[in-house]
Amino acid sequence: MEPRFDEETTQELLDRLARIEGQVRGISKMVQERRPCDQVLTQVMAARAALEKVGAAVVTHNIDECLALPPEQARKVLVRSVQLLTKA
């Protein structure tokens, strides 16, 4: 069985994603307003960094959950996670 998110982790991730969603809406508005490229790019990079932190939180949770699995099952889950991470 693949690791799943508990209530607390789910809420933390959803909160982070909602903030990122707001950042992206703000970037869209900046583009519509024809704001300077450096200002837009700064916000794009901030949103990207926030999204990368969400990914890191997911990976950390996955590893923590795998530690509680039987070794062979944990290995399969971790191998799959590495495949997904290196695919990008």
Language model: regions and residue ranges:
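Solvent-exposed interaction patches of small proteins and small membrane subunits
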Residues: 1-88
